[in-house]
Regions:
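Conserved small/polar residues in nucleotide/adenosyl-binding loops
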Residues: 31, 175-177
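Flexible, low-hydrophobicity surface segments
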Residues: 1-169
Length: 177
């Protein structure tokens, strides 16, 4: 085999990790640096009825608290490319969702503060009122008739159908296996 394939490789980073000499992102402190913490959804699929940031805004050291409505006029983030020139119905999520969350952990608000602990404390004070919606947890269930619709622009929860290569030739060659 090659130099690394199938062989144990000596890790070079272990000595500095076990001796406490490694530098982590938390160790970096720059002048004027601020910290952001994103408030994330506890639900896999839910309507956002209201977001109350008033208590978070009162925490000393908080620079600002924003929700998706503050960025409503900004373009959503593209999350897919046109595979092989095929049109797709891929959802383009926003940095912070405004009306509906479609996965657990989706960002709904952000707190910027003087340090990370303050930002985390303030984030915990944001109250989000959700209306939970039905969910599915597998692709097979998601495309069945009557399954909860995640994105309106992807009927039957199908973003796109794409084939490439020689399907007929591949199917014929499988007969001989």
């Amino acid at each position: 085999m090659g130099k690394y394939i199938g062989e144990s490789v000596l890790r070079k980073e272990d000595p500095r990790l076990v001796t406490g000499e490694a530098k982590y992102l938390e160790d970096i402190q720059l002048s004027g640096m601020v910290h952001a913490v994103v408030k994330r959804s506890d639900y896999a699929h839910a309507k956002i009825k209201n977001i109350d940031t008033s208590e978070a805004e009162k925490v000393p050291g908080v620079i600002g608290v924003w929700t998706g409505k503050d960025f409503e006029d900004m373009n959503p983030m593209p999350c897919a490319w046109q595979a092989g020139g095929v049109d797709n119905n891929a959802n383009t999520p926003r940095v912070l969702e405004i009306d509906k969350v479609t996965f657990t952990g989706q960002g709904v608000a952000v707190v910027v503060a003087e340090d990370r602990n303050i930002a985390e404390d303030a984030s915990s004070k944001i109250v989000v009122d959700y209306e939970e919606l039905p969910t599915v947890v597998s692709a097979e269930e998601a495309i069945k008739p009557g399954a909860p619709q995640l994105h309106e622009n992807a009927p039957n929860n199908i973003c796109m159908e794409w084939e490439c290569g020689n399907q007929e030739g591949t199917e014929l060659s499988l007969i001989h296996i």
